[in-house]
């Protein structure tokens, strides 16, 4: 079992851990943090700690009340195929929650249950203020002191770091990640900037409530021919767009980049790069995605041209040994690991690298994870398109 601490996912955090040294500290207690922690347990690594500045699954719990997972859950474990939303072998959100498309709050509760079941050592309400490596040890600064670890897995995700830039006046808009419930929004005429999953989700719920929506995107995600949902819309979103209420109340503006948003006498004025002007008395919604938490540790990684961290085949920093990345910010060449069913396949890669550095035998561990499709080390199989028929 993991090393015991003075708190867990259901208890209060303590500053006593500041005097401890760990083999691994995982920053972030979301799907990636909890999932990679379980992989460490299975690999035989015991002396580790998960820290989160809030609570287990808090980013999921903060999603709009109506927002659901676009990836469906199904209890397919009996035939050796993991539920798409599972973060660990033997677990199926569909089975435990009896829900195909869970809400954020439902999945947060699911993560908390898993953390408790595996007795994972979690220090909640622990905000990492700084990370530096001195000699062979990482020093993680908190309000209560310094945590020491030989390895760090950065799994803080993206949701708490919304992208608020992109055009003049973007600060006048409200990011969709800050909306508690679309049903609670005042106004009858909404301008939504960003037509990928978050934008379509917002438009769906608002139009279902009889609100008028104009949805803008610099591209046209709903027209993409690729089968990769990292680029094109999910099947779940396409189905929603075919609902009568969506067609009646939502007007799409593809290939229409927004140049500015201004506020004039209580009226929001949206201008597009091609000169069109749209007005509304309702604050525009910004669905432009997330900048990601990896910016916080940019000094510990080289940077790709797209701004994401450069990582090795083991998802380790190429300039700071022992610093690993896990979760939706993982990139390898053109492959984007932004969904749970994608980035979970890298948990065991990281766990094996750390376990091997501690001289722990990992052959059986790797075989078990490979048998469940949870060990993706051959990226040549990625990027395959579906047949058109």
For each of these PLM feature ranges, what is it?
Residues 2, 103-106, 151-209, 304-318, ...:
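Glycine-rich dinucleotide-binding loop and its adjacent helix/turn
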Residues 2-5, 291, 308-389:
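C-terminal, flexible cofactor-proximal segment of oxidoreductases
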Residues 22-49, 191-208:
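N-terminal Rossmann-like FAD-binding beta1-loop-alpha1 element of flavoenzymes
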Residues 25-27, 147-159, 193, 279-291:
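Short hydrophobic core segments
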Residues 46-52, 212-217:
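Short beta-strand "acidic-cap" motif of Rossmann-like dinucleotide-binding folds
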Residues 53-108, 216-234:
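Glycine-rich active-site loop/strand segments that organize a redox cofactor
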Residues 124-138, 254-266:
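A conserved short coil-to-beta-strand element within the FAD-binding core of flavoproteins
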Residues 208-302, 359-373:
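A Rossmann-like FAD-binding core segment of flavoenzymes
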